């Protein structure tokens, strides 16, 4: 189970069980499941509701708690990819996940040929923030 959706008693109902890494997913199993429909990896980014996430549903049926990602961020989330914070339900852009001192290793340019220069990365991050704000404004509660 994902730590956020474990059965009654939550992760504390498993006192003798260590929290394990959530199951791998995505191309070449280079990512980890963050929720039943979310697969993220340092060099993959995040897949949400795509075929790459199908395996993540299996985590709901495993009895021991798992936790994916790097350092805590956002509202109950963890850093999932550079600049991305995810919980078991959704992902948001989060600049704290760009921190050079994060618990996750940075991907070297020779491992990731799609890495952008600083200005392109900044522009993409700003566009994602604007899209996220616009999406939040259109939600009705």
UniProtKB/Swiss-Prot annotation:
The modification Glycine amide is found at residue 9. It holds the Pfam family Hormone_4. One of its GO terms (cellular component) is secretory granule. Glycans are attached at residue 117. Keywords: Amidation, Cleavage on pair of basic residues, Disulfide bond, Glycoprotein, Hormone, Secreted. Belongs to the vasopressin/oxytocin family. This is Vasotocin-neurophysin VT. It comes from Pelophylax lessonae (Pool frog). The lineage of its organism: Eukaryota, Metazoa, Chordata, Craniata, Vertebrata.
